[in-house]
Structure formats: structure tokens, C-alpha cells
Design a protein with these regions (language model features):
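N-terminal signal-anchor transmembrane helix
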Residues: 66-70, 92-110, 120-154, 159-177
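Soluble catalytic domains of enzymes that build or remodel membrane lipids, polysaccharides, and related
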Residues: 140-368
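Non-catalytic terminal accessory segments
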Residues: 1-127
Length: 368
């Protein structure tokens, strides 16, 4: 089994290297044609270094800039593998009507222009959040309360690229909503809380206010950082309660259920968590990954809030997430059960969003 795993890793590295060679070769053909470069050694070193930056940072942890370089390179890879084959085909046909060098120069220039547009538009979408509003009616009676306004933000991935300025946008938009309660269904930080602490983001995040409090759950990236205790400690300092397979009542008006992430195999099921719940009261649940909508509905959850999918983050990845999840983004109602999946406030990897948008969700819940 161990040898099979090594074989898989080796195969992936070989395929990845071939793809990086293809991207690098296209870049060299254009640059050498435009500028007349003949020596490719330095160019090959730079492309190779950038291509493996995300792997190198796992070894050279004292060079955190490599993670940023590697993150941005992921976007370059995706769109290069979409655009460069088209550019190569264009050059092949154009060379029959104009000089090949001219075809290379102009096709490369157009490709770079498309790249610039993709990155400019993607960065704008990533750093310019919108507020999505949903109306949900739960036909249960709550003494002294007819409605509940929820501010929900998932997948902030606070760290290097989703930093202080983006956090301030979150605080501004959330407080502007004047919510009754703030819910954060996972991936609050980007893996390890070190950057969050280093940038002193906690006091800024603490400025988010709601009468009923701020609650969250763990996402897969909190586990990836292997520093869950440190993360929980930071959240506790800023009065954000992280629910770990817990069910609590909010002012005896409704239940709030918070699940551990699917990453933790021993987490409790919805059925177990709901076993002691008085289902005459509304039940709102947070589960980072939206894999178990049916289980939540069968257990008696009224409203499930999730994130994780990013709606693919960079088109056409949304085609994949649409097939992976029953609901990869938006709202669905099935009988008395409601589910909302957010595309997230932040981003993983490159600070780009195409086919999705950085968002905060405002849920207006009404009761009988």
C-alpha cells in the first residue's frame, strides 16, 4: 500500500512536470521571438522555481512568500492550460497566411491580454464582496420572537492573501446588516492560525457584533493546519464560540447545532446530535461541507448552513462542484427543510474568483 502511494505521487509529479514544460515552452517561444533571446537557462530556472514553489514551501517553511507565489501560479496553470492550446492552434493556421514569427507575436499578445482581463476581473470578484439575501420561513412558534436575522460568512481563509483589509470589509458589511446572530460555518483561517495572530486580526474580527453572539464551526482547513487547539484559543479570546459536535439553545428560542468537519471521521451524526432536541422549536445547524443534506433533513434540522465549495472559485470549476454536491451554491427547500450553501467570503490559493463572487449571506428567518 505504501509503495502504491509513492507510485501515485511519482506519477502525479511526472504529469505535472510535463504540463509545466508545456507552459514554459510556450512562454519561451514567445519571449525569444519578441526579444530575440537565445539563452534559456535563467528562464528555465525561474519557471521551474515558480512551478514548484508550493511544494518547496513545505520544506523551506522560513520562506513564506513561496506559498503566495505558488498560490497565484495555480491560477496561471489553470488558464494557461485552457488558453495555450487554442493559441498554438491559431499559430498553426495563421502561419499559412502570414509569417510564423508575426503569428507567434500577435497570438501571444492576445493571449496575454486575455490573461490580464481574467486576472483583473478575478481579483475584483475576490476582493469586492456582495451581500446575498434569502428569506426562510420556519413554521414553528417562538415565544416573543417572530423573526431572526442571520449574518453568515464562510470560507474566509484569513491569512496571507485574505488579510486585514479583507477582514475589515467583512466587519463593515456584517455590522451594517445589524444581525441578531452571526454564524461562521468553517474555514475561518487558511490552515494555520500563525498569520492570523501575527497580523493581529483577532481584535478587528472582535468588532463584529450581534445581540445573540457569534458562533462558528471547524472547516477542513482548520484541520489541515494541525493547530486546532491554538485556533480555538484565538477564537475564544475574541468571543467567537466554536461548536464542536454541540447543540445549544439560544435564549430558549431555538436550537443551534454545530458539527465538526467531515475531515474528522469520528464526528457525531446528525441523528445522534438531534436525539435530545425538542423539535417543536426551530433548529438551525452549521456543517462546513454540504454532503449530508438528506441526513440533516431526516434528523429534523429546519435550516442548514454550509460553505466549502467556493462554487468552484474559478470557472469552469463550478461544473465540477455542481456534480459533486446536491447543492453547491445558493438555496434549496425540500418540504420543511431549508439549506443554504455560500460560495464563501475569501478564497483558497489564488485571490481570484471567476464564475463566483466573494459574498456574505443575510438570512431573514420568520416564525409562526
Amino acid at each position: 500500500m505504501k509503495n502504491f502511494r509513492y507510485l501515485n505521487i511519482f506519477t502525479i509529479l511526472i504529469v505535472y512536470t510535463i504540463l509545466m514544460f508545456y507552459i514554459g515552452w510556450n512562454g519561451w517561444v514567445w519571449l525569444s521571438t519578441v526579444f530575440g533571446w537565445e539563452s534559456w537557462g535563467y528562464y528555465a530556472f525561474i519557471v521551474g522555481f515558480i512551478s514548484y514553489a508550493y511544494i518547496l514551501v513545505q520544506v523551506f517553511k522560513f520562506l513564506p512568500f513561496l506559498r503566495t507565489v505558488g498560490s497565484i501560479w495555480f491560477a496561471v496553470i489553470q488558464y494557461a492550460l485552457m488558453l495555450l492550446p487554442l493559441a498554438d492552434i491559431a499559430v498553426f493556421f495563421l502561419q499559412f497566411s502570414i509569417e510564423k514569427d508575426t503569428a507567434i507575436i500577435w497570438t501571444g499578445a492576445v493571449t496575454l491580454l486575455v490573461f490580464f482581463f481574467i486576472f483583473a476581473y478575478g481579483v475584483f470578484n475576490a476582493y469586492s464582496p456582495v451581500v446575498r439575501k434569502y428569506d426562510v420561513h420556519i413554521p414553528k412558534k417562538v415565544e416573543g420572537r417572530k423573526s431572526l436575522r442571520i449574518a453568515m460568512a464562510s470560507d474566509m481563509h484569513f491569512g496571507k492573501l485574505s488579510g486585514v483589509a479583507h477582514l475589515k470589509r467583512l466587519v463593515h458589511h456584517v455590522n451594517e446588516m445589524e444581525p441578531d446572530i452571526i454564524l461562521l460555518p468553517g474555514d475561518i483561517i487558511d490552515d494555520h492560525p500563525g498569520v492570523f495572530i501575527q497580523k493581529n486580526m483577532g481584535p478587528i474580527m472582535k468588532q463584529m457584533k450581534a445581540p445573540l453572539g457569534v458562533y462558528g464551526v471547524l472547516g477542513n482547513h482548520e484541520y489541515y493546519g494541525r493547530a486546532v487547539p491554538e485556533f480555538l484559543q484565538e477564537m475564544d479570546k475574541i468571543d467567537i464560540r466554536i461548536l464542536l459536535d454541540e447543540v445549544i439553545t439560544i435564549e430558549d428560542d431555538f436550537y443551534l447545532v454545530g458539527r465538526r468537519d467531515k475531515t474528522e471521521r469520528d464526528r457525531q451524526s446528525f441523528e445522534n446530535l438531534m436525539s435530545t432536541v425538542d423539535k417543536s422549536l426551530p433548529v438551525i445547524a452549521m456543517d462546513h461541507q454540504p454532503f449530508e443534506l438528506k441526513q440533516a433533513a431526516d434528523a429534523g434540522v429546519d435550516l442548514l448552513l454550509s460553505g466549502h465549495t467556493h462554487r468552484g472559485q474559478m470557472a469552469p470549476n463550478h461544473i465540477v462542484t455542481r456534480r459533486m454536491y446536491e447543492l453547491d451554491w445558493g438555496y434549496v427547500q425540500k418540504g420543511a427543510f431549508h439549506a443554504i450553501v455560500s460560495s464563501g467570503f475569501g478564497f483558497w490559493g489564488p485571490p481570484l474568483r471567476l464564475g463566483s463572487r466573494s459574498e456574505i449571506v443575510q438570512v431573514e428567518v420568520t416564525f409562526e
